[in-house]
Design a protein with these regions (language model features):
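Lumenal/extracellular ectodomains and adaptor appendage modules
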Residues: 1-191
Length: 193
């Protein structure tokens, strides 16, 4: 998983590495590979394979189904999606169909902060002149990885919503104050008999 920051979102790029050591091709068109993706994802897109072929896939209710014929050797499936963040942080719950000890999380150095009891910081790696911080998953019986991302740049709309609620509360308080004051003034001006 490669996690990059956006404005009020994170971009998640997942790379599935498949190794077919048999002499036969692996055909998943009748029994697709399935990946359960996080809730709330937006703008999903599948990248082309290294051969330039389009990978057949379907996304229904956060379940990605991949129908492809994989040749002998190594293949990669790369796809990307956005996850919206709220006030600069986000919790990701990602379920995998394989052991978590094969999962790595990378993020460009100096931007996002990642925290999880299930991840161990494993150092830095450089790709294409970008240095990434890298975490490896601890061995676990669970196939659910949970981690929190913070330091995500926040959109001004998130703050304007909070400002709007505060202003509305202030207006309601002032209106109630004047209503109460007007009612008290009417009571004191009424003649007593």
């Amino acid at each position: 998983l490669v996690i990059e920051s956006g404005l009020g979102t994170v971009t998640v790029t997942e790379v599935l590495a498949l190794s077919n050591s048999s002499a036969d091709r692996i055909d998943t068109r009748n029994q697709p590979l399935k990946q359960k993706l996080p809730e709330g994802l937006e703008n999903f897109r599948m990248m082309e394979s290294s051969s330039g072929a389009v990978i057949q896939h379907y996304l229904e209710n956060n379940l990605l189904k991949i129908e492809q014929d994989f040749p002998t050797g190594n293949s990669q499936i790369i796809y990307q999606y956005l996850l919206p963040a709220w006030f600069g942080s986000l919790e990701i719950n990602r379920e995998f169909n394989f052991s978590l000890d094969k999962v790595e999380v990378l993020t460009p150095e100096g931007y996002l902060q990642i925290k999880s009891e299930q991840l161990i910081f494993s150092g830095k790696q450089s790709f294409h002149d970008i240095t990434y911080l890298t975490w490896r998953s601890k061995a676990s019986d669970s196939n659910l990885l949970t981690f929190t991302i913070s330091n995500i740049p926040v959109t001004s709309l998130q703050y304007s919503g909070v400002s709007g609620v505060i202003l509305l509360s202030l207006f309601a308080t002032v209106a109630l104050f004047f209503q109460f004051r007007l009612n008290n003034k009417k009571r004191t001006e009424e003649p007593t008999i």
